[in-house]
């Protein structure tokens, strides 16, 4: 079972990764997406078909978080490939994330332990690092303003950025397609849950 851990620059990252996996002949991944991302009907249509399930980050109840973790643990344990953004939110500055969120990512370890305990066939869980490189970022203006603001580092959810407007997303897509530029999705070498590189021949 694979756990993909990409860098995170835009709300378009998840659909882009889903498309890249499809083009590479790789299986799709399930992933948690903020409830605010489903406010755009067009993107909601595609995201729900790319394996996204909703996560309401405004809910702080312990029960809600436990249910999300149990769902993720069970899905990975049953062999569902998963995607987690280890930074937890989009990078405001474009730099690689250093303050990693271990919440849902930790469910991979729990799923692996449960699989070993129940002696399931093929219990191995591998982490695949992934980087994204863009010429343009849809929400760049909003993210830059947020990074420069005093409260930028503490804000977690931006619910009214460019992604919420279907017309803006369509206009952005046209501009990107008219550029002589490429978007890169790079998959790194798989690692086991202890961080050790895995021999490709053993996969």
Region roles according to the model:
Residues 200-203:
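C-terminal, non-catalytic macromolecule-binding modules
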Residues 1-192, 196:
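Soluble catalytic domains of membrane acyltransferases
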């Amino acid at each position: 079972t694979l756990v993909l851990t990409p860098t995170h620059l835009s709300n378009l990252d998840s659909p882009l990764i889903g498309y890249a996996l499809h083009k590479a002949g790789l299986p799709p991944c399930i992933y948690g997406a903020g409830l605010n991302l489903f406010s755009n009907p067009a993107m909601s249509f595609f995201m729900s078909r790319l394996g996204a399930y909703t996560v309401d980050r405004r809910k702080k109840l312990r029960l809600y978080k436990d249910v999300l973790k149990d769902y993720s643990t069970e899905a990975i344990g049953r062999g569902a490939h998963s995607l987690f953004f280890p930074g937890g939110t989009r990078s405001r500055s474009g730099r690689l994330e250093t303050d990693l969120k271990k919440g849902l990512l930790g469910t991979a370890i729990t799923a692996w332990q449960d699989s070993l305990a129940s002696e399931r066939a093929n219990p191995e869980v591998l982490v695949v690092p992934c980087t994204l490189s863009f010429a343009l970022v849809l929400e760049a203006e909003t993210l830059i303003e947020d990074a420069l603001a005093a409260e930028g580092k503490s804000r977690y959810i931006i619910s009214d950025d460019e992604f919420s407007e279907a017309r803006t997303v369509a206009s952005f897509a046209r501009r990107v397609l008219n550029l002589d530029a490429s978007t890169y999705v790079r998959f790194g070498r798989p690692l086991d849950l202890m961080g050790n590189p895995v021999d490709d021949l053993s996969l």
